[in-house]
C-alpha cells in the first residue's frame, strides 16, 4: 500500500530546528514518507543553532530525500500531486504573513500554494515573537482558511516575551493525523506555565 506523503517545509525560526527535526523523525517512524522543503533562509543561513549544510544532511538522513530548495522544484508539488498533506514547521511570522496575503516567493510558500490547489490539508506550526503582535492578524486570517490546520500553540515566555507564540511541536504527529481526517486537533491553545508575581508559585494558564 502506498505511504501517505507529507511535504515538510521548514522556514527560518532557527532556534526551533532541533525539536522540529525530532518530529520529522517521529513522522518517519510512524510510516509516513516525508518530503523535506526549505525556505531560502532555512536552507542557506549558518546560525549559532545549526549550520545550513548540517540541516540538509540531517533531513536527507532522516527522510531519504534531498530537500526541495528552489521554486522550480517546489512548483510541481500540486500539479503532480506529490503530497497528501503539507506541513510548515516552524512557520515564522514572516512566512505566515506572506501566506495569508498571497505571496509565494520561497520554495516553502510556493510548495504550500501548489499543494492547496488540490484541496488537501496544510498544517502550520507557529513560531514567532510577534504572534500576539504584528503577526496576530495573519494567524487570524489563516485560522478561517479551508484546509488549514494549526499545531496547538502557546505563549512560550509570557513574562519575558508576552507577544511570542510557539507551537507545541510534540503535538505535530497528532495534528497531522487529525488533519488527514479533516479535524482540527483540540485544544488549539495549549497551556503554559508561569510563576506568580513573587516568583514562588507556578500558575498554569
Briefly describe each language-model feature range.
Residues 1-122, 127-205:
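A cross-family phosphate/adenosyl-ligand binding-site feature
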Amino acid at each position: 500500500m502506498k505511504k501517505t506523503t507529507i511535504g515538510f517545509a521548514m522556514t527560518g525560526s532557527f532556534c526551533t530546528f532541533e525539536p522540529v527535526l525530532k518530529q520529522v523523525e517521529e513522522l518517519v517512524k510512524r510510516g509516513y514518507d516525508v518530503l523535506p522543503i526549505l525556505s531560502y533562509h532555512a536552507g542557506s543561513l549558518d546560525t549559532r543553532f545549526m549550520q545550513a549544510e548540517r540541516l540538509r544532511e540531517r533531513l536527507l538522513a532522516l527522510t531519504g530525500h534531498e530537500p526541495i530548495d528552489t521554486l522550480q522544484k517546489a512548483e510541481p508539488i500540486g500539479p503532480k500531486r506529490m503530497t497528501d498533506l503539507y506541513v510548515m514547521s516552524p512557520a515564522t511570522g514572516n512566512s505566515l504573513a506572506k501566506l495569508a496575503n498571497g505571496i509565494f516567493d520561497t520554495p516553502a510558500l510556493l510548495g504550500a500554494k501548489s499543494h492547496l490547489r488540490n484541496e488537501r490539508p496544510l498544517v502550520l506550526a507557529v513560531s514567532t515573537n510577534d504572534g500576539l503582535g504584528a503577526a496576530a492578524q495573519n494567524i487570524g486570517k489563516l485560522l478561517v482558511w479551508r484546509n488549514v490546520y494549526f499545531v496547538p500553540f502557546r505563549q512560550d515566555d509570557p513574562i519575558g516575551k508576552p507577544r511570542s507564540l510557539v507551537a507545541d511541536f510534540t503535538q505535530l504527529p497528532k495534528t497531522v493525523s487529525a488533519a488527514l481526517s479533516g479535524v482540527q486537533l483540540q485544544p488549539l491553545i495549549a497551556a503554559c506555565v508561569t510563576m506568580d508575581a513573587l516568583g514562588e508559585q507556578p500558575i498554569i494558564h
